[in-house]
Regions:
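Phosphodiester-processing cores and adjacent nucleic acid-binding clamps
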Residues: 1-214
């Protein structure tokens, strides 16, 4: 048993992005640090919303420019998969509301450094359904408010239909890290844990517990 400070940066393995989509090396050649600075410190419309000091602090908090190249690659691939899923969920032509919501969510996920997390969750939920034959719940908790999660089939509830708020799940002012509550059938839970351990390595998989005290 090890203790872990919630103030520490998240420890996550890398989701395997196909090389023909892009690599960290190709992104280093394609994008400058100024490109990344502008992309990660502005809003989804490209407007400046942070002071220079706040922007520099944000870059540092995300892990510096080397880390930003990885986050951008993951964010671009997440966008690619999300729009594929959006057309499967909503049809060939998306409404303005659907596109605006998707772009807003993707921008928040990117600028908070979480695209890789969503890719990994998508991966093991897909494996549970398609490879392991494990029943997966439709989604619950605040993650059910994410249209991106719906498009990736992490959840099966359309937040737009039920007026669910994404900000309850993830927003820049939220202190705690996001988590996606996922229900697996009892007899399949260990199958999913074993699959994740094999693919991402046992050192990247752990059971966690939180104790409350008065």
């Amino acid at each position: 048993v090890e203790t872990y400070s919630i103030d520490s940066g998240p420890i996550m393995p890398k989701f395997p992005i196909p090389e023909d989509f892009g690599t960290e090396e190709s992104y280093h050649a394609k994008f400058t640090e100024q490109d990344l600075f502008d992309e990660f410190t502005r809003d989804e419309h490209g407007n400046v919303v942070l002071s220079q000091e706040q922007a520099e602090k944000k870059i540092k908090t995300l892990g510096g420019y080397d880390r930003l190249y990885r986050i951008k690659l993951e964010a671009d691939y997440l966008r690619h998969l999300t729009y594929i899923g959006a057309h499967q969920r909503y049809g060939e032509t998306l409404t303005e509301e659907q596109e605006e919501r998707i772009n807003f969510e993707l921008h928040i996920m990117k600028t908070m450094g979480f695209p890789g997390y969503f890719l990994i969750v998508m991966d093991f939920i897909r494996a549970a359904r398609e490879e392991l034959g494990v029943s997966v719940g439709p989604g619950r908790g605040s993650a059910a408010g994410s249209v991106v999660a719906y498009c990736l089939r992490i959840t099966d509830l359309d937040p737009l239909e039920y007026d669910l708020l994404f900000e309850r799940f993830l927003n820049p002012d939220r202190i705690s890290l996001p988590d996606i509550d996922t229900d697996f059938e009892d007899c399949g839970r260990q199958k999913v844990l074993d699959w994740v351990s094999r693919k991402y390595g046992e050192t990247h998989v752990a059971h966690i517990v939180t104790y409350g005290k008065m």
